[in-house]
Amino acid sequence: MSIDIPKLNDFNEYWLLVKNEVIKKLNSELNLWDDACKFSHSKFHQLIKKLDLLGEWPTTPMGKLKTNKETFELFDDYYPEIKKLKRIFNLLNASKLTEFAISEDARYRPYGGYKPFGTHTGRCTPSSKWIFGTAKWARSFIKPPFGCAMVNLDFKSQETFIAAVISGDEKMLASYKSGDFYMNTAILAGMAPTDATKETHPEIRKIWKTIVLATNYGQGARGMAKALKKFNKTYSEVAGLLMKYKEIYKTYFDWAEAKSNHAQVHGYISTSLGWDRHFPYAVPINPRSLMNWPVQSEAGEILRNALIRLLNANIKVCATVHDSFLIECQLPELNEQIRIAKQCMIDAGTYIVGAEGMQVDVEIHRGNFKPEPADQELFNLIFEEIEKYKTSQKLNQGQVTYPNKVRSI
């Protein structure tokens, strides 16, 4: 894919020189680092206490609160403060991020970083050598060449559609077709009126979104209760909501349990096209690891089938990213190529699961790739500091500078 080479070169040249200034700006709300960018464990302890997480936060053998990536990832989806904290730690450790392999034609080709079929579900293995596997703000280095646009085509709530169709759960399929699965589930649970929307009942929707996504990954009520504590939900209340969720979509959960039982008895589980997962004889199997396997694996089958269709239709595919494709289109052909690409993806879904109705979202990037707003803000902040540094050096005419070179991100 095409990369913004001037911006990449600026980052490589000036990042180490502006890193502390970026950290200070990000720290203005958290106030956990001093002017020398030294971390305060006592202030961090106060923050975790304020968030009411002291009883759940993992500690080191010496009794200190852990500050590693894995610990932050337990809480960052539910606490904005932890997400920002994780982002700062990532930047502090980034004297050198993963290398971009830039070819002679100034395009990025991830030799060794892109690993299809790397997981037991047949999905790609995440890798920091792959631009979509490293820091999300770095995606802003992706830039279409002159006269082109980059288009991200994403299967909308793909796993919900697959689960509804292959399990035969009509209620789940109706919720998917409503356009807002989380809100419709809240309505079915009696927690929102029939005319409720994302705008009128945002908190209720967030609660059910958390329950749905956590259940997809085999999480129980205790884990969900941690995430829903900020909505003043107790463990007992969350357990009740989880039970209600399983009652609403009873057909799906009965089917998923039957698939899990079959795998444990026979020692294997398969997709419709024959991607298998086999289990060693007489070795205990974690049932939770099987609950979402059929859905995830069928999603992988759809993605691969869609990729074949896109390439046969002469669509320029730059990347596959979980449930989406990044394609490059010439501007005069943009709308037509998007139409063809969407149809290829929809046809792939129909072919694999045997039912129509899969939806595809489209994002068009005519300039640099736009990640989530928080990640875009971070990218902008980094380059604001780089521009300030470059301007200050121009004003200091007699001063010689020796920029720290960083080979890549």
Model segments located where?
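Short active-site loop/helix that positions an aromatic residue
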Residues: 48-51, 156-171, 189-190, 331-334
